[in-house]
């Protein structure tokens, strides 16, 4: 087995591009119906799971793609990952896909506030980052306003493959 990690520094929670970046990341690998899951798991059968995520920290943030594959699929998997990134940097996301992911994120944001433990995590998050109660409303509004062209611009702005680190570990 090979573990594959691809990543780079990323937008922070308080950056203006954060909501759009969250949407972009979800399209690529942030949920089960993402492009990476559809391609690398469903179509190619290289892995049981692949995903991408953004980790926001107070001083710096990072973005990562993670998966495990059989050794013989390592290079092909990396190639497919970069094909999907290239598509997002060069082609607009279809409106139907964008709306599906927006609705997914709306539900995901609501789940972050559902229940006492989720609300306490949200409060901790707001305190750590100096956010006020309007933060979530602002995120939802920015997601709502995001267009296919904006997603294309964000992908081109933040996902230059030459700025990404690729790490693999496992048997050669």
Predicted regions and their residues:
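Active-site phosphate/pyrophosphate- and oxyanion-stabilizing loops and adjacent acidic/basic residues
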Residues: 38
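His/Glu-based metal-binding/catalytic segments typifying zinc-dependent metallopeptidases
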Residues: 1-35
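Low-complexity, intrinsically disordered Gly/Pro/Thr-rich segments
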Residues: 147-156
């Amino acid at each position: 087995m090979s573990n594959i990690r691809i990543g780079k520094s990323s937008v922070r929670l308080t950056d203006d591009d954060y909501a759009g970046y969250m949407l972009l990341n979800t399209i690529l690998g942030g949920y089960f119906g993402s492009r990476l899951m559809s391609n690398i798991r469903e179509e190619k059968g290289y892995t049981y799971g692949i995903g991408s995520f953004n980790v926001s920290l107070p001083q710096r943030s990072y973005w990562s793609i993670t998966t495990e594959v059989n050794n013989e699929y390592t290079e092909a998997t990396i190639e497919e990952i970069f094909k999907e990134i290239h598509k997002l940097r060069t082609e607009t996301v279809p409106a139907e896909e964008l709306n599906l992911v927006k609705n997914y994120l709306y539900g995901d944001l609501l789940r972050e506030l559902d229940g006492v433990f989720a609300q306490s995590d949200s409060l901790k998050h707001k305190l750590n980052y100096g956010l006020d109660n309007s933060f979530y409303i602002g995120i939802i509004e920015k997601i709502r306003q995001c267009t296919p062209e904006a997603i294309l611009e964000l992908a081109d702005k933040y996902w230059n493959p030459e700025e990404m680190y690729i790490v693999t570990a496992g048997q050669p």
